[in-house]
Every structure is written in structure tokens, then in C-alpha cells.
Amino acid sequence: MPCESGGLECATIMAPIDYADPEAGATELALIRKQSSGRAVGSLFMNPGGPGGSGFDLIAQAVDFVANDTLQSNYDIVGWDPRGVGRSSPVTCLDSRQLDGYLYGVSSNPVGSDGWFDERAEAARGFADACARNTGALLGHID
């Protein structure tokens, strides 16, 4: 698969949505690799953690920062987006306009009041419901 960044290789693999029930379906994971500059003795998988960190972007944008010359000459450096992140079947909750309203909407109740807490709780339930509705079965299996 072509990569956005030169000198890198990109691919996707299929992984079970539920490892306990592989027949329940699969999801696509995006990978990126910088081949060793020498003779590789193996592959080194890197991910920034998070949750929500893109290992794909980490390698595409900062491989020289996270892997020094010694590592790059001895290992293929591989990054991936975990399920639900970036290029790997991302979790989808709200569109940009809705997300702005959720994050930056102004309450008619004073901050910290019972009414404000009730509004925030209702907004959080709406956000969670939108994630479930727009992401589907995968959401229950995000690691």
C-alpha cells in the first residue's frame, strides 16, 4: 500500500473484533514500517500509548526521534493504529459541529450548580449514545 511519507511501507491487516469469538467479525488495522538501514535482526513495534495515540503517525512523523540510528540499522521500525484509532476502524461519535457544541457549548446554568451537572450528565450520555450508534459492535471491543 502506498504511504504518505517517502521511504516507508504501509499495509493493513485484519484482526478479530473479539479475540474470544473470532467468528464475530474482523476489523482493519493500519501499519507502517521503516525498513532497517542495515541487516535487520527483527522488528521493533512502537506505539505512543494513550488511549488514542497513533503509532502510524508516530513512525510517519517522528521515526528519527523515537528510534536512534543504532535501532534503525538493526531493526525494522513498525507502528500501528490500534483498533478504534486513526486509520484503524476509528471510533466515530459526533461530527465536527456536534463535537464543538458538546465541548464548547454554553450552559444556561451556573457552573457547579445542580442544573449544570444535570446538563453535563445528559450531554455525556448523548455523546456515549452517539459513539455506540455511529461505531457499532467494534466499540465494545476497543482495548
Across the structure, where does each feature detected by a protein language model lie?
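Gly/Pro-rich cap/lid or specificity-loop segments adjacent to the active site
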Residues: 1-143
